[in-house]
Amino acid sequence: MSIESFKVVLVGESGVGKTSIITQFIDQTFQEDIQSTTGGTFSTKSVVCDGGKILKFEIWDTAGQEKYRSLTTMFYKDANAAVMVYDVTRKDSFEEMKNYWANQIKDNSPEKIILAIAANKSDLIEQETVDEEEARNFAKELNAIFVTTSAKSSEGINSLFEEIAKKYSGATNITIKEEEDGEEPQVQEQKNTNTVKIENPGKENKKPKKKGFC
């Protein structure tokens, strides 16, 4: 069974919910108050692709504060995918994504990097200030995946990473496999399908592995 590392970088303004998206994907948890990321940290989670191949996501959480922006460029090296996150209630976060983050990725990332846009905090739709159609059109311009997400309710979180895995692996169907606590992840062969399965290890393996960067 082969294992391939797959580097994903999340970028966007401070406070848009990058850390919360990762925490929800890795641990299925949400915290109202999270300290802003300084520098960058990464977490890991594996997906199982067709034929039993394992894609090990290395998910990098980067700082959105202006004073750390110059550091972000180094995280794009060898990245397979970049997710630009904006807050649907903050028009400024969308404009910065268009005018700054998209250009930073273009100038510093590998040519064939997979792009995705996460329209986060969809649970606050009544406070939305960003037109979704405009955001979707921008995603089309970049040939980027577009997913509306809520780190609080978990809406769209798995879909975001599923779509990235599909685009990379060529899979056409997605099955999320939730493991019972303490159960070891298993690879199940499925004939005549292209499937990516999100693996959810037991509690002893469930906490994200993080490395600090200063």
Please give the residue ranges for each predicted region:
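Conserved beta-strand segments of the P-loop GTPase G domain that flank and frequently precede/overlap
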Residues: 59-60, 83-87, 117-120, 149
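Conserved P-loop small GTPase signature centered on TRAFAC-class small GTPases
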Residues: 1-15, 19, 49-54, 111-214
